[in-house]
Amino acid sequence: MSEPGKHSPLDPLFDTNPWYKDVLGGYRDLRADELISGHQAGWEVDSLCINTAVYLPWLLGQCLKAGVVIKRAVLSHIREAKGMSHTGKPADIVVNATGLGSLKLGGVEDKTMAPARGQIVLVRNECTPMLSSSGTEDGPAEVLYIMQRAGGGGTVLGGTYDIGNWESAPDPNIALRIMKRVVDARPDITGGRGVEGLSVVRHAVGLRPYREGGVRIEEERLDDGTWIVHNYGHSGWGYQGSYGCAEAVVELVERLRRRTGSKI
């Protein structure tokens, strides 16, 4: 945990008495000699890292195995989705999980949505355990984390959390700061050789679907009678919260079906 008065978008994850200490195993407070310089407190906890390059194809395969029909289309209005059912009949219920697209999608146009720009550096160097910090000296939009992916997926060095920034190209100055923060915190990642010892695979930028007020999971009825179940605005925790949010969506859909006799 960084010094007080320096706020980060990730602050809800960091507390001297974190809510998840009794949910995840292996929790312990770090000793003073284990802390990163400039930090007042820290802890260790069992966690996991998802290699998305492996996980997403597997998840798609599970959907296909379950009989899900995949279609690609460009929609200007959410109501257009009701005509895309593989049955050839209009759907009575549409689940909207369009992420950042919900900002401009007709029929939704949620102005509380904004991009939260994230820039990372993917390297071949290995570094365990994972590390995450509540803030840095480089401004409120810049954070520090190190995540080694399983299955030879490289190690992700981060990063940024810049709300309202649409820039999709990596910034070389930010990339240098990311790498410097990482080697300062974990010099062992390069065997003490500094930034020059990092074997960079690529630089990347993603736009997280940030929503002021948090994720939106609720039902809404359009003027034409179509029911929409919204599930968007997960910001940077879409993978972590996906199963819980999906269960909430299923509950809403089933409740609507019982109440209205609708078909999804």
Region annotations inferred by a language model:
Residues 35-40, 124, 155-160:
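Short, basic/glycine-rich phosphate-binding loops at helix/coil junctions
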Residues 39-93, 97, 102:
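Helical element adjacent to the flavin cofactor pocket in flavoenzyme catalytic cores
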Residues 33, 192-264:
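C-terminal catalytic lobe of FAD-dependent flavoproteins
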Residues 6, 100-102, 162-163, 235:
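Short, solvent-exposed loop/turn segments at secondary-structure junctions
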Residues 1-67:
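Flavin (FAD/FMN) cofactor-binding and adjacent substrate-gating region
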Residues 54-62, 177, 181-185, 248, ...:
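Amphipathic alpha-helical segments that form well-ordered structural scaffolds
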Residues 129-212, 221:
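Active-site lid/adjacent beta-loop-alpha segment flanking the redox-cofactor pocket in flavoenzymes
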Residues 77, 81-136, 168-176, 185-196:
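Central helical "cap/lid" subdomain
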